[in-house]
Curated annotation (Swiss-Prot):
Heterodimer of an alpha subunit and a beta subunit. PSII is composed of 1 copy each of membrane proteins PsbA, PsbB, PsbC, PsbD, PsbE, PsbF, PsbH, PsbI, PsbJ, PsbK, PsbL, PsbM, PsbT, PsbX, PsbY, PsbZ, Psb30/Ycf12, at least 3 peripheral proteins of the oxygen-evolving complex and a large number of cofactors. It forms dimeric complexes. This is Cytochrome b559 subunit beta. It comes from Ostreococcus tauri. The gene is psbF. It comes from the Eukaryota. Its cofactor is heme b. The lineage of its organism: Eukaryota, Viridiplantae, Chlorophyta, Mamiellophyceae, Mamiellales. It is found in: Plastid, Chloroplast thylakoid membrane.
Length: 38
């Protein structure tokens, strides 16, 4: 199974990471603010 078999998988991979990375960063900053306030 090669990574460059279908461009759709690459596009889906980019889309998932484009949505997942800011979400994880957003949740991380929220938890950090929660700990800082307490």
């Amino acid at each position: 199974m090669s990574v460059k078999t279908y461009p759709i998988f690459t596009f889906r991979w980019l889309a998932v990471h484009a949505l997942a990375v800011p979400t994880v960063f957003f949740l991380g900053s929220i938890t950090a603010m929660q700990f800082i306030q307490r």
